[in-house]
Amino acid sequence: MSLRHFLTLSDFTKQELENLIKRASELRKMQHAGEIYQPFVGRTLGMIFEKSSTRTRISFETGMGQFGGNAIFLSPNDTQLGRGEPLEDSARVISSMVDIIMIRTFGHEKVETFAKYSSVPIINALTDEFHPCQLLADMQTYYEHRGSIENKIVTWVGDGNNMCASFMQAAHQFGFELRVAAPYGFEPDSALMERFSHCVSLVENVQDAAKDSNLIVTDVWASMGQESEQNTRARRFAPYQVTPSLLDKADPEVVFMHCLPAHRGEEISHDMLDDPRSVVWDEAENRLHAQKALMEFLLKDKIKLPA
């Protein structure tokens, strides 16, 4: 297999994504059963963080350890990345010493530049534009709880941010209808809306957007780097809080997701995460299993897979 990267969901085919989801579920079952599976002995993951994280670092580092490999944490404070070394130089050097690299950063162009000059697979662990690893976990979670998401209705409530953008790509790749309920001025990128107009629509009224929905998803009102806008956003997004009563408008089998961290009393009511229709804890854990499946796929030519 030629060198592959995972910068957005569009880098993989529909079949590849569906296979990844199923493999992630298999890996979850194996881990829960206490099965030891270590295909990455002698392999190293480089983890480049320019944005702080809880779930991303723990899931990648733990996943690499469970696979028998090693993970190295790199922050701008610890490397030449924070001292002005060109990205293309860093990409060449770091990729010569590790087997795979994940990057959590701000501008999406940074991961694109890294991928261009890297000799090993690059994983986008979050940029301001996209968050594809979270979508793998979300699709795995829906698959485990409700089966195929194809032809289902998904409702995104809130900011048209990087998570929303990745859900738009997922709607196309996995074949579901996505409704976006966002305040005026906070809609998704217009180019993405045009590109995915066949499967994505804007619905002004959040109650209408939730009607008959199979999955309702939201995220924080102000993402990392937008803290100065918090008060303004709180006023604009107040009508878009997700509550159990909003889920009552949806399909009886609806599930609720949030990539976390969540701000109870803001984008969700205080009781939303504990609602029986919430699957956020499985969703959070599945970052581990989905990313293990992803790394296994990207390095499959370098490891010995089970027969």
Curated annotation (Swiss-Prot):
Reversibly catalyzes the transfer of the carbamoyl group from carbamoyl phosphate (CP) to the N(epsilon) atom of ornithine (ORN) to produce L-citrulline. It comes from the Bacteria. Its EC number is 2.1.3.3. GO terms for cellular component: cytoplasm. L-ornithine binds at N162, D219, S223, M224. Pathway: Amino-acid biosynthesis; L-arginine biosynthesis; L-arginine from L-ornithine and carbamoyl phosphate: step 1/3. It catalyses: carbamoyl phosphate + L-ornithine = L-citrulline + phosphate + H(+). SUPFAM superfamilies: Aspartate/ornithine carbamoyltransferase (SSF53671). Its main location: cytoplasm. Keywords: Amino-acid biosynthesis, Arginine biosynthesis, Cytoplasm, Transferase. The gene is argF. It comes from Psychrobacter arcticus (strain DSM 17307 / VKM B-2377 / 273-4). Belongs to the aspartate/ornithine carbamoyltransferase superfamily. OTCase family. It is an enzyme of class 2 (transferase). One of its GO terms (biological process) is arginine biosynthetic process via ornithine. This is Ornithine carbamoyltransferase. It is found in: Cytoplasm. PROSITE patterns: CARBAMOYLTRANSFERASE. Carbamoyl phosphate binds at S53, T54, R55, T56, Q80, R104, H131, P132, C133, Q134, C259, L260, R287. One of its GO terms (molecular function) is amino acid binding. Coiled coil: none annotated.
